[in-house]
Amino acid sequence: MAAPVLLLKEGTSRTTGRDALRNNILAAKTLAEMLRSSLGPKGLDKMLIDSFGDVTITNDGATIVKDMEIQHPAAKLLVEAAKAQDAEVGDGTTSAVVLAGALLEKAESLLDQNIHPTIIIEGYKKAYNKALELLPQLGTRIDIKDLNSSVARDTLRKIAFTTLASKFIAEGAELNKIIDMVIDAIVNVAEPLPNGGYNVSLDLIKIDKKKGGSIEDSVLVKGLVLDKEVVHPGMPRRVTKAKIAVLDAALEVEKPEISAKISITSPEQIKAFLDEESKYLKDMVDKLASIGANVVICQKGIDDIAQHFLAKKGILAVRRVKRSDIEKLEKALGARIISSIKDATPEDLGYAELVEERRVGNDKMVFIEGAKNLKAVNILLRGSNDMALDEAERSINDALHALRNILLEPVILPGGGAIELELAMKLREYARSVGGKEQLAIEAFADALEEIPLILAETAGLEAISSLMDLRARHAKGLSNTGVDVIGGKIVDDVYALNIIEPIRVKSQVLKSATEAATAILKIDDLIAAAPLKSEKKGGEGSKEESGGEGGSTPSLGD
């Protein structure tokens, strides 16, 4: 009898074939089910508590999947899909995960009919490509040539409202103010493109949070805000027509890299040593004054003696500014970052109409307005507590991304599940023209798309199945813009009339992220998991749950 061959390390578990596939599908479906209730304007929040006890309350899909510390490898594929969605378009993360889960659920039914995973994957790819082809035909191109026109602003307002309505804690006048701020910020930094759209660099829009007041106290600053204060009481608090030196060099005597000692034998030598140090710092300040600087913003420290000399020269100074802020200042002010003060020239200076220290709540902040490059803006958020501010920041980021997407590709689609239903109907027609078992996979893709309006109907308080049947019937009659008005709790024939719209770029990316994640999981037929480290075993974590366990068992998503 031949000796056994040990191929894998002792303790390694292996699940193969349909067991591995079903295990992975179950893990992905479980994650999608967790996010399901967070979809749409009336989506519910999740309370996430990390290992340090910090609490996050949010219904933002990207934040939920990032903070959940998911362990199952298949569920991690959905997390990566959500991250890709967030990085690419900044919105639609919950939709992408929910749709991927629905695609896998429908695929599981096909697997039960003994349809090979390869056929399902090919069918899904054909359905995805057909959906991408149909989207521009079902959308409406909008005119945004003049961003300051009432027509363009009205369209941008509708997009921002659709995004913020599902997330933002504000309503009424507060919500309107936030929408206006977001639109003003985007319009301010938009650069025209040859195709009629606009390029928007979101790096030029900075968001700062300051506890105190209410959301309505938030302001948009056409310039930048530094969460710092002027370093010396003798310095001016307000400088107009500011010539600004942006430094990443320290205004202090730096310690030598090698250890050194000095031998002092008399008090005069101490005085001479200190005088030389003061002269060194004074020379640096004199150099900055000689090139015309009346404001100094430093990434590193500013010595007390240097502060004194700067104050005597009437120069406003701020120290220990974040590197990211220094880089934004370089762009906004038209400055060059000064690394060597002795080599600084007047051409290195940036310009702003006003630099002023102001009190915000209990703190002081430095406002830089009227910058040379007026495209840099700063949104200063106010709120009653840190959790509200964090959620407001996430919401505004999503709205900024949504507006950027519509400016890059100015085509809008009907929201409220209308586009998914219309795509599903068209894909079923397309499936009939495709021969073989792939037809079933395309129909399954269409069924999965209907999961979105189904969930929206549920969150609106409607009876889900009867609502879906009603929506299908209306779309069959040619009412292609029929969707769910979640806020009103009813089905409407024209979601455009209620400003329920979505950018085509977001929807295209949702389809791409969900299809790629689902097909990647369907391709896996072998799950090989190494034994956990001994320290993990001592912690009581079994290897079977870590690796997905035996085929058909419930996978563990988290720790």
Curated annotation (Swiss-Prot):
In alphabetical order, the GO MF annotations are: ATP binding; ATP hydrolysis activity; ATP-dependent protein folding chaperone; unfolded protein binding
Task: Map out region (Disordered) in residue numbers.
Answer: 535-559
Regions of compositional bias (Basic and acidic residues) in chain numbering: 535-547
Write out the entry's keywords from A to Z. Answer: ATP-binding, Chaperone, Nucleotide-binding
Could you tell me which InterPro entries the record lists for this protein?
Chaperone_TCP-1 (IPR017998), Chaperonin_TCP-1_CS (IPR002194), Cpn60/GroEL/TCP-1 (IPR002423), GroEL-like_apical_dom_sf (IPR027409), GROEL-like_equatorial_sf (IPR027413), TCP-1-like_intermed_sf (IPR027410), TCP-1_chaperonin (IPR053374), thermosome_alpha (IPR054827)
Q: Name one GO biological process term.
A: protein folding
* Keyword set includes Chaperone: yes
Q: State the superkingdom.
A: Archaea
Q: Which residues form a coiled coil?
A: none
Known role: Molecular chaperone; binds unfolded polypeptides in vitro, and has a weak ATPase activity.
Family that this chain belongs to: Belongs to the TCP-1 chaperonin family.
- Assembly description: Forms a Heterooligomeric complex of two stacked eight-membered rings.
Return the protein name: Thermosome subunit alpha
This chain's source organism reads: Saccharolobus solfataricus (strain ATCC 35092 / DSM 1617 / JCM 11322 / P2) (Sulfolobus solfataricus)
